Amino acid sequence: MKYLVTAQEMKQYDKNTIEYLGIPGPVLMERAALAAEDFIKERFDAVKERTKVLIFAGMGNNGGDGLALARLLAADGYAVAVKCVGDMQRATKQWKSQWQTLQHFPVKTDSNIAVDEYNVIVDALFGVGLSRPVEGNYADAVKEMNKAEGFKLALDVPSGICSDTGRVLGCAFLADATVTFGFCKRGLVLYPGAEYAGEVRTANVGIGQESFLGQEPEMYTYEKGSVQLIKRNAAGNKGTFGKALLVAGSTGMAGAAILAAKAAYRTGAGMVKVITAEENRQIIQQGIPEALYGSCRQLTESLDWADVIAIGPGIGREEQALQCLKTVVERSRKPLVLDADALNLLAEESGRMLAEELRAQGAEGRVILLTPHVGEMSRLLKRTTAECKDDLPTCAKILAERFHAVAVAKDARTVVCKEQGACYLNTTGNSGMATAGSGDVLTGVILGLLAQGMDAPEAATCGVYLHGMAGDLAAGLHTEYGVMAGDIAECLMKNQNKKA
């Protein structure tokens, strides 16, 4: 597991490290500068004589990190210059101390620095906690850095990026790489911040889990190889690995059902039954002969058969779809995944009573998972898509709390939130997965994991991770331009063992 922190969390951990663990602030600053120096030396030591580093330093402790970096690089034989931005009279205490020390080293600090003479540009203007648009001299500095040629490195967070949401505040430094300190910041993983951060390295500067003091970060992600799948029972049979019921596919939308059913099987479900429009029967049986078939008239009896249920992919919003949703909600209390049109129906006036019933069931303990994309989430929460996209973690948390459910908020960086506890931010996947049917595959993946006995939060987080991994494998075969949802389904679990 890899923690992703907010600015407020990071500042608290920094404070805990200094006040409770007894590690002085200047020591943390020195270790941050050493980490940044190591990063630069890895890339440029072989061409040190031809490397000239220009550091843009603000007046806060991020700027202090930049001054300390300048000193270390100069002591190691690099040509270094510092361009200060802001009022030195308002600089922090640590900044002023670093500035005084820097005067004893061969670092150019005058105001007439020609940026085009330098081939490594370092952004040390703001760091974490920026909450308002970059303006004035700071905006000019960001634009000047962006226009410069050469390698661009940000310290902690690219200036102009909100460290909590990844939003651009006015203008932002476009880095080739970012060395972030202590823990990775959310805004370096969420878009568009991830694009501005470039390659991200999280450096250990002495702020570790000991600094939590019982208050862990509220978001995490998986590191490669850390996903644990359920161990298969060597003596098991098809019933052992779960009976998954999938309500999907109105007339002409059989593809959604086929994709989801294939994904459930590929993920390990023992049996999958598809409830779909009668007109889809032949297509379903040809497209996925392994699946059982049932018409909508057989839904009630199929609920008794199933261990877990998913409804929504391609069902449409007509009366028959609403009646199927009504049956699933009212006549079963089994674990339920709701996707696509099932969510759209809940957001409409015709589905209002069903939404209230679902909330009541969630409060009573029914396992419920909601898997909206940003548009569906906006309809469920009665917010604009822009509002949801700008702060997906908060919106996902609200949805989880409202339905007493697990919310899987799908976007370029999918967020999984449960009613209580930390949220998961997914980092697998690529732009090729923004294609019709991709969400249907994810529904099937989560359904398949639930069928095997995974608890809901784990099935959601693991499912999103595996779905993204399959998308990455598919892009490796077809490029991001050529990925289709069927490719994602076919790549599920390839090259995977018990650990993914």
Report the location of each language-model feature.
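Internal gly/pro-rich beta-alpha loop/helix module
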Residues: 119-120, 125-217
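Short beta-alpha junction loops
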Residues: 86-89, 158-159, 342
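Generic preference for hydrophobic/aromatic residues in regular secondary structure cores
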Residues: 108-109, 173, 416
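Small-residue (G/A/S/T)-rich helix-start motifs and N-terminal tracts that mark the onset
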Residues: 1-82, 92, 177, 188-340, ...
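N-terminal small/polar loop signature for handling phosphorylated ligands or for N-terminal nucleophile
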Residues: 68-146, 282-294, 300-301
